[in-house]
């Protein structure tokens, strides 16, 4: 993409009401624009990152055996009355009446809809297990939306729902999602710690939140320090084998959100192992048995010929929220430092002397060669000063900057800058193109 043709409305300063770094930088980098309280338009740069985050989530769900479908944003109120949750959400639920006076709602979550889909189609234990997932926009009418995409009213969520015959099968489904979450957050450069959590209005008796530590986190969290540096399991997993040891390894050490915190148990840890911090929730998983299947009569015929309600689980990831969490965890005074897997562009080509024949030719060569190699390239071909070009590339977080100037061209070299480390080195253009072409930022962990 040539910057001269791109839509990138960057700001020199963030609006005064942007309180946290991620909100400030997303506005300054031209990623989002507020349309109403807690509601944002996703501009081209922000949408590019959102789609890359979504792609990783989708790949890890598919790898773990979940099956994608797409459920409506507008849901029947009667389904929520059937589950008994219609009044639980109170004013956070946006309720709608259509022209036929039917009660509808803008879905804050989708347990009722997916249970309705399941019960209409699956009747026998022989058709289990199933795990269905949905990536869809949700709406919750927050009393005080703030912090940009971190606590908006409209947001993109991935919700997966598992259906099993018995508690043993349900626990295996829970473990698969637990491990899949470790991998997907790791691929985005996040160190997410699973913590025992309150089930809230979703319900159930087993729940973990996945927390990214950050000074601007909305809640206090407490954990053993070793959990922060534990490596993700990676893709080479027998998803239908015994994953309990992997889960045990990450749940044996103390970790809890503020609601579940046990001060005595935490104090029993050696002082040097205790970590108290603020955290951002990026994922939440639940096992809730028959909370929805029983009242909604999602039944299957078991091996004994008797009908039983299925055991269910729910597994959520705040896809749009993840962008804010990544920025909170990875930025500097110059702007965003995207992990390469989710960066809007892999490489920024900077022409320091637009209109100089040799510089123009070298930039065109690099731009076309890197595009042909499958890299996402942003070519700053604007006739502006070099300092402004560097500032823009740093602000939007392009991981690699290929800098072409008349002095370097005369010496037969270009400069390559690493956004994360700030390191620069000079090399012949062909060598730099080969290095950048060989990288695969989207590769699985």
From Swiss-Prot:
In terms of superkingdom, the source organism counts as Bacteria
Question: Recorded E.C. number(s)?
Answer: 6.1.1.15
Q: Which SUPFAM superfamilies match?
A: Class II aaRS ABD-related, Class II aaRS and biotin synthetases
- UniProt cross-references to Pfam families, sorted A to Z: HGTP_anticodon, tRNA-synt_2b
Q: Which GO terms describe its biological process?
A: prolyl-tRNA aminoacylation
Which residues, if any, are the signal sequence? none
Zinc as UniProt keyword: no
Q: What is its main location?
A: cytoplasm
| One Gene Ontology CC term in the entry | cytosol
Q: Which of UniProt's keywords are assigned here?
A: Aminoacyl-tRNA synthetase, ATP-binding, Cytoplasm, Ligase, Nucleotide-binding, Protein biosynthesis
What are the protein's GO molecular function terms?
Answer: ATP binding; proline-tRNA ligase activity
Q: Where in the cell is it found?
A: Cytoplasm
Tell me what reaction this enzyme catalyses.
Answer: tRNA(Pro) + L-proline + ATP = L-prolyl-tRNA(Pro) + AMP + diphosphate
PROSITE patterns linked: AA_TRNA_LIGASE_II
- What family does this chain come from, according to its entry? Belongs to the class-II aminoacyl-tRNA synthetase family. ProS type 2 subfamily.
Its job: Catalyzes the attachment of proline to tRNA(Pro) in a two-step reaction: proline is first activated by ATP to form Pro-AMP and then transferred to the acceptor end of tRNA(Pro).
- Protein's name in the database: Proline--tRNA ligase
Species whose genome carries this gene: Caulobacter sp. (strain K31)
């Amino acid at each position: 993409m040539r910057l001269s043709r791109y839509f990138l409305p960057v700001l020199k300063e963030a609006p005064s009401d942007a309180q946290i770094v991620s909100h400030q930088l997303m506005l300054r980098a031209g990623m989002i624009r507020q349309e109403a309280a807690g509601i944002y338009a996703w501009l081209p740069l922000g949408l590019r990152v959102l789609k890359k985050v979504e792609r990783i989530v989708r790949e890890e769900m598919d790898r773990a055996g979940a099956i994608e479908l797409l459920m409506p944003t507008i849901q029947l109120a009667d389904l929520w009355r059937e589950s008994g949750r219609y009044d639980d959400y109170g004013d956070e639920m946006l309720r709608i009446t259509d022209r036929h006076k039917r009660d509808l709602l803008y879905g804050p979550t989708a347990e009722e809809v997916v249970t309705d889909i399941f019960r209409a189609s699956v009747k026998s234990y022989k058709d289990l297990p199933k795990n269905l997932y949905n990536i869809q926009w949700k709406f919750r009418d927050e009393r005080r939306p703030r912090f940009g995409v971190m606590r908006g009213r409209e947001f993109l969520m991935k919700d997966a729902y598992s259906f099993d015959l018995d508690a043993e099968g349900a626990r295996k489904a829970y473990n698969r999602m637990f491990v899949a979450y470790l991998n997907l957050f790791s691929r985005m450069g996040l160190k997410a710690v699973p913590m025992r959590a309150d089930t809230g209005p979703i319900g159930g008796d087993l729940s973990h939140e996945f927390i990214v530590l950050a000074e601007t986190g909305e809640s206090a969290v407490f954990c053993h320090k070793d959990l922060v540096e534990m490596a993700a399991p990676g893709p080479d997993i027998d998803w239908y084998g015994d994953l309990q040891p992997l889960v045990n390894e990450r749940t044996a050490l103390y970790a809890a959100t503020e609601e579940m915190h046990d001060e005595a148990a935490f104090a029993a840890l050696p002082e040097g192992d205790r970590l108290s911090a603020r955290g951002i929730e990026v994922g939440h998983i639940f096992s809730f048995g028959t909370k929805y299947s029983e009242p909604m009569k999602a039944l299957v015929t078991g091996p004994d010929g008797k009908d039983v309600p299925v055991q269910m689980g729910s597994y959520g990831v705040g896809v749009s929220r993840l962008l804010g969490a990544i920025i909170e965890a990875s930025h500097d005074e110059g702007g965003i430092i995207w992990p390469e897997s989710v960066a809007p562009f892999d490489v920024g080509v900077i022409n320091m002397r637009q209109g100089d024949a040799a510089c123009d030719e070298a930039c065109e060569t690099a731009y076309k060669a890197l595009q042909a190699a499958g890299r996402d390239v942003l070519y700053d071909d604007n006739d502006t000063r070099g300092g402004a070009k560097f500032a823009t590339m740093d602000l939007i977080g392009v991981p690699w900057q290929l800098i072409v100037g008349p002095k370097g061209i005369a010496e037969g070299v270009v400069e390559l800058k690493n956004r994360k480390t700030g390191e620069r080195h000079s090399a012949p253009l062909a060598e730099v193109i080969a290095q950048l072409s060989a990288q695969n930022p989207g590769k699985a962990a």
